[in-house]
Amino acid sequence: MPQVSRRRHLQQLSGVFGAAALSAWSRSASASEADIPPEGIGKGIQHISYSDIGGRPDSVQVMFNRQHVYVGHMFSDGVTILDASDPRALKPVNFFTAGQNTRTHHLQAAEDLLLVANGANIVAMQSYDNMRGYFENTLVDSITKTKKFRSGLSIHDISKPGEMREIAFLEMPGFGINRLWWPGGRYAYVSAHFDGFTDHILCVVDLKTITKPEIVSKWWLPGMNRAAGEPATPKGKRFALHHMITAGDRGYAAWRDGGFTIHDISDPANPKLLSHINWSPPFAGGTHTPLPLPKRQLAIVADEANAEKCAKGLFHTFVLDVRAPENPVPIATLPTPRERDFCTNGTFGPHNLHENRPGSFQSEETIFATYNNAGVRVFDVRDAFAPKEIAYWVPPVPKKLVDPRPNIGLAAKTCDAYVRPDGLMFVSDWNAGMHVLQYQG
């Protein structure tokens, strides 16, 4: 790859994807959501089946183990287990709850164990008149209703298909965990809130003794330790770790409006910052999912769209050259879906990326991405400077709104995707259950 100036590329990308680009994009997309059938529409992806997850359609992160799917919920305070031995007919077989007002929406499966995020059901404890309040305020300033909940990391034995038996719980005083990364092994990398901090920070957990997990380190951006008197982060911006993904002795972390960091984690008890880059401004922020492609020394980083009807402009997924980890450089963005006007209702833009977990579909050339309102997108990134969309699937509009927050549009909220090595996908939507799809590439 030729040498590229980070500042130059940010300026170029900002010019290409600014307000003028949004206007031109909107004019070029004409099809409406009303013409999407129940099985969705797409290219290169076949619809296999649909499940309302036993009447709990608010699905978020998906894990797969021993022919069973484990799905965390956004609003239902629990985890549903589905028998996926026949992908054409998913069968709910069990439901775990950590208790009322405890959200367990994110989880990680490896080595016949399931690690589950436990934290405040934030939606039930906030008082905003629209969704943007959650994304534009620190977590501690968002909570206006005090309720009892469980905060910390629960560990479950899932060696018996269809069951999850809790074998350990690590309490984390605060509002709890948002998301975590654990592909197996000794250490889990957790995004958690602790009392005294403004929002979720990095917490490294040692699992050497699985029944006695132990916190060995914490790391945060300057300004997040309110109890220590650190100067406040910018008002109207949310600096918070969404999550970290590791590759070897490097950790890649997304901090919402706080940008993107790369860490040396060769000593998990002492993670060291190598670089910190933030493209907001000029972009809208919401940096959400950091997917390293270590063999190619690239990272794919998705910014989560978080405003109704594109009120903040378009959000993007960036391709970064990380050959020099002390100086990551944005070199491209994944193409924005254009076959219809996705800005007319609800939120439109990137959400998650399939994370190349061990045992799942793994590729540094084919990227699976989920989009609010625009379903699943598959990209060819063999030319990192010119990614191409090679397949897509768009879901129908949900029949009803599950999200209890006010002023939320009735639109698809395609959330997460787990892709098996054979290309079979389990795709969640926090309003509309789960679709099973088959990638045909």
Feature-to-residue mapping (PLM):
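Flexible coil/turn residues that form the inter-helical turn or adjacent wing/linker of helix-turn-helix
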Residues: 2
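Residues that mark the N-terminal boundary/hinge immediately upstream of a DNA-recognition element
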Residues: 5-6
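Feature marking well-ordered beta-strand scaffolds used for ligand recognition
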Residues: 9-25, 31-441
